[in-house]
C-alpha cells in the first residue's frame, strides 16, 4: 500500500479512490475523479471534528457535481447497496507521518482507499490498564490534548469513522474525539 501513496503524509490512497469513483460513477471523467479526491483530502476546517463532519457528509451523502455542461449528478464514494463492489483492504502498521513523529496504528481498514476504521490491539499482560493505554494512544494520534501537540497525525482521523481498542476478547469503541469515559 505504501507504494500507492505519494507520501506517508497522505492518508487516503488516491489511486484506489479514483478507480472506485470511476467504477461506481461510470459517467464520471478521470479529471473529475481526481478533483473529487483532491477536494476530499484538502478540506479546510478549523478543527478535527469539523473536518471529520465534512468528510462524513461527503462520503455518506455523495457530492453533486456538474460535468461537461451536463446537469448536476450525485457522485457516490461507496456502494452501500452492494458492499462487495467496494475495495476493502485491512492492513497492519499503517504508517502516517506527523509533524514530529510517525504514527503506526496496529490495524487500519480502508474502503475504496479511504481509511475508515483504526484498531489498537493491546497485550493481555497489561491487565486492566489496556483500555486506558489504547485510548491514550488514540488521543495522541489525534492530538486531542496540548501535551500531544505535534506527536500525532490528526489528518488520518479526518476520514476515520470508528476507533476500536481491543485486548484478547474484550473491546471498546468510539469515534473521532470521543472522551475516555464514552468508550
Spans of features found by a protein language model:
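An alpha-helical interface "stripe"
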Residues: 1-183
Amino acid at each position: 500500500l505504501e507504494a500507492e501513496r505519494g507520501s506517508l503524509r497522505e492518508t487516503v490512497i488516491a489511486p484506489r479512490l479514483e478507480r472506485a469513483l470511476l467504477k461506481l460513477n461510470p459517467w464520471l471523467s478521470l479529471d473529475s475523479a481526481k478533483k473529487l479526491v483532491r477536494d476530499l483530502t484538502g478540506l479546510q476546517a478549523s478543527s478535527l471534528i469539523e473536518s471529520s463532519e465534512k468528510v462524513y457528509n461527503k462520503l455518506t451523502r455523495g457530492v453533486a457535481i456538474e460535468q461537461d455542461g451536463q446537469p448536476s449528478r450525485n457522485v457516490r464514494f461507496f456502494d452501500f447497496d452492494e458492499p462487495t463492489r467496494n475495495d476493502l483492504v485491512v492492513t497492519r502498521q499503517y504508517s502516517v507521518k506527523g509533524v514530529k513523529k510517525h504514527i503506526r496504528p496496529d490495524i487500519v481498514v480502508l474502503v475504496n482507499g479511504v481509511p475508515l476504521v483504526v484498531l489498537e490491539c493491546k497485550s493481555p499482560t497489561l491487565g486492566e490498564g489496556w483500555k486506558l493505554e489504547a485510548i491514550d494512544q488514540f488521543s495522541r494520534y489525534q492530538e486531542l490534548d496540548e501535551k500531544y501537540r505535534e506527536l500525532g497525525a490528526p489528518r488520518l482521523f479526518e476520514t476515520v469513522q470508528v476507533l476500536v481498542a481491543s485486548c484478547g476478547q474484550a473491546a471498546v469503541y468510539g469515534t473521532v474525539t470521543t472522551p475516555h469515559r464514552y468508550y
